[in-house]
Amino acid sequence: MLKVENVTAGYLQSPVLREVSLQLEDNECACVVGANGAGKSTLMSLISGLMRPSSGSIMFNETSLIGLSPSKIVDLGIIQVPEGRRLFPRMTVAENLLLGARNARARPETKASFEKVYHLFPILEERGKQKAGTLSGGQQQMLAIARGLMAKPKVLLLDEPSIGLSPILVAEIFKTVGGLVNDGISVLLVEQNVRAALAVSSHGFLVERGRIVLSGKSQDLVEESAIKRGFIGG
Amino acid sequence: MDLTILLQVILQGLMLGAMYGLVSLGMTLIFVTTGLMNFAHGSFMAVAMYLALSLFTAFHFDPYVSVFITVPTLFIIGWILFRFVVRRLLEVHILMAAQVTLGMLWVIESVLSTIYGNNIQSVPTVIGSSKVYLGPLVVTGPYLVTFVVAAIVGVLLFLLLQKTDFGRSVRALMQDRKAAELMGIRVDRTQTAVFGLGLALLGLAGPLVVPMISVSPFVGLQFTLFAFMIMVFGGSSNLLGSVVGGLMFGLVDSLGRFFFTGNIASLIPFSALVLVLLLRPGGLLGEK
């Protein structure tokens, strides 16, 4: 279980996140929604160890994540699929996937992981030798998620997977994301597309200007007017 | 004018250029993985050359034997320097790290000058006067050895980068640092190893070229400039570009010295660089 408690982070004068608390249960998909600049990606950076909060705690089961290096956090099984994909453009699809599996837990299962992700995203096997930078937007997103899965995540942090994708692709990818909890992976989804995010998750958190202003079961949140105001793709 | 002589000049230029390419490759690798411009790069090459000189003076080691000592020595120096000095400054600001390499440049120059004096020196080798005949062309031993070693090391480096875990980590770090960190790649360790590798390449190049190029305490900056020019010439973030740039540089320099003398000859490579950059601002193989 991933627990963020009272985290404040960002610049001293104007923090990006203020006293943010949320939690992700085991085998659950939860979403963090809100407009651009609300602080969602900062949250991802904090959990992954790329940034430190100025106060608050971030716990994964009994372990505190604060102060751990990004590579230690990856070793714990917390894997981020960053905003904008951030693939290695001049490396092939297969090389990108191979790099995903480099942590100590994932390495022994590399071959099995390749089979799993090729089964989930057959197009990636087809394009195995193609340079990642030449793939289409949707294929790149699939590769980014697949690369994250190669790392054998216990927790998958997905940062804005729907950006730049057509509604059909969004639906397709979110369907896959929703299925991940059945494989024992907990998913924390950060999204601008509120409707799609709530449809695939069990709990949701709405962030506005650095604070959590609303939280609850996704099916309840859909009815809230604050959410309805923020509907994108609705 | 004898065509044979011209071809010989071209051949020698290319052969020496291969080693320049390796030197520049080290600088490029450091630049793309850390963002740091190593102003002391050429100075470390001078260190390697003087080490070869000392090993010859003290133990009569041929430079081609000294290589086996200078390569690990320079690697270790590089590792330690990066780990304990450069890395800490990089965390503060990249300009501070660049400044420290500039400082190293002057410190190395002073130390070398104190130990060895200011005269130009070179180191002889047993194969110094041996010749190899390639058709109508004659190549002296040192040039041939330098080229062959540079070619072999070049291929080994290519294999390292393409086929090994470490190589993949380096390439990943080059292409997207944040993503590399999210894969669990230890950025600091990778950078330290690359810095050590860059200096190890200098430990290789130094003794190999010292029979052909004389050394003085002040050549450090000149070598750094050459390496930098080649790096920019080939496209700053392009590794293959550094190799090709090195070959071209060797060629242009050799031809320049053949047709012109002294100061004008020194200007030729710089002029060529300016010309190339006017036509292709990103370098020969760089992005537009």
Name each model-derived stretch.
Chain A
Residues K131-L135:
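Conserved ABC ATPase signature
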Residues L12, L68, V93-K111, L120-P122, ...:
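ABC-type ATPase nucleotide-binding domains, specifically the catalytic core motifs of the NBD
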Residues G56-S64, L76, E109-F114, G216:
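Conserved ABC transporter NBD signature motif
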Residues V33-A35:
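The feature captures the beta-strand-to-loop junction immediately N-terminal to the Walker
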Residues K152:
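Conserved catalytic motifs of ABC-family nucleotide-binding domains
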Residues G148-L149:
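ABC ATPase C-loop
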Residues S48:
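Helix-to-loop junction immediately C-terminal to a conserved catalytic motif
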